C-alpha cells in the first residue's frame, strides 16, 4: 500500500441532536466529500460531549469524539489524516479542535487541518453569493440571518459579511448573532428605518438545530420571531442549515482538495 493510499479524511463537526437537520447537513457534507474523494476512507468525529451523550442515550447512536477517531485511524493503519472541520468560522471551537487533533500528530506521518467554511476572501464572497441565490429576498422584505456569535476575534466575520452583502448590492440582507454585539435588540433600531413589509429569518449555521428551532423561530418571548412580532413585524422563518446548500458544501470540498494537494506536495 502506497503512502497516499494510507490516507483518510476525518470530518469534524460540533454535532446536532436534531435528526432531520443532521441528515440534510452534516451527513450530506460527508456524503459529498465521500463522492468527491472516493479513494480515501472517511471518518467522522463530533466535538460536543452533550450532544454525543444525548444521541447515545436516546437513539443508541455512538459518534466518536476526536480522541476516539484519531485512535481508530491509527489502529486502522492510516498514516496521513486530512481533517475537514465543518465550522463556519475559525473560533474557539476550531482552536480546541486543532489542539486535540495535533495532540495525536506523533502517531501519523502527516496531519493536515483544512480550513473552516469562511477563511479567505473568496470563501466569504462565495458564501455571500450562495445566500443571495438560495433566498433571493423580495424587494420589500428584510432577510436577517442568525449567526452564532462569539467572544473570539473571529466574531469580526459577522459584521464583515453584513458589509459584503451591501457591497454586492444585497441591501436587504443583514447579519445578526445570538451572542456578541450583533444581537436582535441592536438590529431593531436599524429595522425601524427600513420599513419592511415582513422580515424573513434564516440560520447562518451549518445545522438548523437548537438555536434555529428555539432562539430564532421558537414561541418563547425571547426568540427573534417573538421579539420582532411584538414590534409589529410580519415574520417568516426558514429552518435551513448552511449545510443544506450545495454551493456551501462545494466550499468544503474545495478546502478538502486543498488539504489533499498539500499532502501530495509533502509526500512528493
What are these regions (language model features)?
Residues 1-268:
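Active-site-proximal alpha-helix that buttresses catalytic centers in soluble enzyme cores
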Amino acid at each position: 500500500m502506497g503512502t497516499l493510499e494510507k490516507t483518510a479524511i476525518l470530518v469534524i463537526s460540533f454535532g446536532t441532536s436534531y435528526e432531520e437537520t443532521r441528515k440534510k447537513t452534516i451527513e450530506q457534507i460527508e456524503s459529498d466529500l465521500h463522492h468527491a474523494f472516493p479513494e480515501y476512507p472517511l471518518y467522522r468525529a463530533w466535538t460536543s460531549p452533550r450532544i454525543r451523550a444525548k444521541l447515545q442515550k436516546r437513539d443508541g447512536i455512538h459518534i466518536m469524539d476526536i480522541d476516539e477517531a484519531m485512535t481508530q485511524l491509527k489502529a486502522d493503519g492510516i498514516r496521513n489524516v486530512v481533517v475537514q472541520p465543518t465550522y463556519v468560522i475559525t473560533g474557539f471551537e476550531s482552536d480546541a479542535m486543532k489542539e486535540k487533533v495535533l495532540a495525536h500528530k506523533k502517531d501519523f506521518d502527516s496531519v493536515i487541518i483544512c480550513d473552516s467554511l469562511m477563511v479567505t476572501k473568496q470563501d466569504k464572497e462565495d458564501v455571500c453569493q450562495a445566500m443571495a441565490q438560495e433566498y433571493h429576498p423580495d424587494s420589500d422584505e428584510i432577510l436577517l440571518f442568525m449567526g452564532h456569535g462569539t467572544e473570539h476575534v473571529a466574531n469580526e466575520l459577522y459584521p464583515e459579511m453584513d458589509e459584503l452583502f451591501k457591497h454586492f448590492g444585497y441591501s436587504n440582507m443583514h447579519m445578526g448573532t445570538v451572542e456578541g454585539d450583533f444581537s436582535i435588540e441592536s438590529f431593531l433600531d436599524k429595522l425601524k428605518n427600513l420599513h419592511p413589509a415582513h422580515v424573513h429569518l434564516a440560520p447562518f449555521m451549518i445545522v438548523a438545530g437548537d438555536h434555529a428551532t428555539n432562539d430564532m423561530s421558537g414561541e418563547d418571548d425571547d426568540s427573534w420571531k417573538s421579539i420582532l412580532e411584538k414590534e409589529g413585524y410580519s415574520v417568516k422563518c426558514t429552518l435551513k442549515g448552511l449545510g443544506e446548500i450545495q454551493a456551501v458544501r462545494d466550499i468544503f470540498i474545495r478546502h478538502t482538495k486543498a488539504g489533499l494537494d498539500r499532502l501530495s506536495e509533502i509526500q512528493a
